[in-house]
A protein has these predicted regions:
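Bacterial N-terminal signal peptides that target proteins for export
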Residues: 2-11
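A residue-level marker of the well-folded mature domains of exported/periplasmic proteins
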Residues: 23-196
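Hydrophobic helical h-region of N-terminal Sec-dependent signal peptides
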Residues: 12-17
Length: 196
């Protein structure tokens, strides 16, 4: 919930700035393309908040496409927005490596790119809005170490392994438990952000 509030705050600031830019009567429409990675309830809520905020500003249009966890589909969605000539791209990359080239392409064509929740493998984007996933992983590792009193076997369940939140959380987790030689990571499994 706190994460969603952070995103809402930054998206509100973004739309306020866009609203100021679109105040003139003859101002062209400002087109925003949103390339979501999935269709889960958290993403639906984010999409609803983006659309709700856009309603407050004349001259701003938003089109949202979801890749349904498919890297190829998301790359097609971003190409679609590039070809359409959007003024801003908001992207939550399904997986970092497959999405890096297409995000870099948009950025190099002068389209501002805001990455939300998930990064790519380069710095070719305008802004990132999201959590410090390394710190989250480190905090979990310290919690596990404390709970196990510095000794035991651990199985790590990660999010989608190619996504930056999962990669950064794993790095933070490993950094924390590496301080405890009697804690062993005996297995790691990709849970793909699913609860089951």
């Amino acid at each position: 919930m706190i994460e969603a509030m952070k995103y809402t705050k930054w998206i509100t600031v973004l739309f306020c700035l866009l609203g100021l830019a679109a105040c003139r009567q003859d101002a062209p429409r400002f087109r925003i393309g949103v390339a979501q990675c999935s269709d889960d309830s958290w993403r639906h809520k984010m999409n609803d908040e983006i659309l709700r905020e856009a309603m407050f500003y004349d001259g701003v249009s938003v089109e949202i496409r979801s890749a349904a966890d498919d890297n190829r589909k998301q790359a097609e969605d971003v190409h679609y927005f590039i070809d359409k000539g959007v003024d801003l791209l908001i992207i939550s990359a399904n997986e970092a490596a497959p999405m890096t080239p297409i995000v870099e392409e948009a950025y190099q064509k002068g389209i501002p790119v805001i990455l939300v929740d998930r990064k790519i493998l380069s710095d070719k984007y305008t802004a990132y809005i999201g959590a410090d996933n390394y710190e989250i992983g480190r905090a979990v590792g310290n919690y596990i170490a404390s709970s196990l009193k510095g000794k035991g076997n651990v199985v790590e369940l990660t999010g989608l392994s190619g996504s930056t939140p999962a990669m950064e959380r794993h790095q933070g987790f490993m950094a924390a438990i590496s301080n405890y030689p009697d804690i062993k990571l005996i297995d790691k499994a990709d849970a793909a952000w699913e609860r089951e």
